[in-house]
Amino acid sequence: EVHKAGANSYQELVNYFKPQFLLGMSATPERTDDFDIYKMFDYNIAYEIRLQQAMEYDLLCPFHYYGITDITIDDQPINDMSDFNLLVDEKRVDYVINKINDYGYSGDRVHGLIFVSRKEEACKFSEMFNQRGFHTCALTGEASEKQRQEAMDSLESNKEGSLDYIFTVDIFNEGIDIPKVNQVVMLRPTQ
């Protein structure tokens, strides 16, 4: 996986080894950081398939994408740089819940991931969702592999009291496989 191949630490690792053949795979070879992944592999492309083609071949699960305008509180738009109190304002939490209920999910119950920008935001959102009858947890990069696995297992479970949502910061962005996830909510900027 060469998604982060432009990072110095990654370059050091790749330059340390001297393989006869180096294979790199990425779902996102065009990068916003201006790093040329193609150049790293001498512009050799063994196979390429684009998102639309992969969906046509049923290699990916179908999805619906909805862009939703965030709420304005006290005439201030909410964004990643907003005051923390605005990010977790009661009105915003209720607004988010109304929107996720409006757009729904596929299946008997929700198995959702909600991405936020800050650890404190994940913890507070989880607490406020739980107060409103949901079963959620907050996971960040500080969570152990055991904690992550237990949360994923609970999210996948259909048992009473299992997780409805995991609020996450800086993990589950890539290379994650939780087949039952049927709703993803981005409450942070995306590229």
Whereabouts are the PLM-identified features?
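Conserved interdomain linker/interface between the two RecA-like ATPase lobes of SF2 helicase motors
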Residues: 44-116
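Residues immediately C-terminal
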Residues: 1-4, 12, 174, 186
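Post-DEXD/H (motif II) to motif III coupling segment of the RecA-like Helicase ATP-binding lobe
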Residues: 3-65
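Conserved helicase ATPase core of P-loop NTP-dependent helicases/translocases
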Residues: 113, 121-173
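A short beta-strand-to-loop transition that corresponds to the Sensor-1 phosphate-sensing loop
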Residues: 25-29, 118, 169-171
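Switch/connector loops and helix/strand junctions flanking conserved nucleotide-binding motifs
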Residues: 31-35, 74-76, 176-177
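A short beta-strand element within the Helicase C-terminal
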Residues: 164-189
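Short glycine-/polar-rich loops that comprise or flank the Walker A/P-loop
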Residues: 18-21, 44, 60-63, 132-135, ...
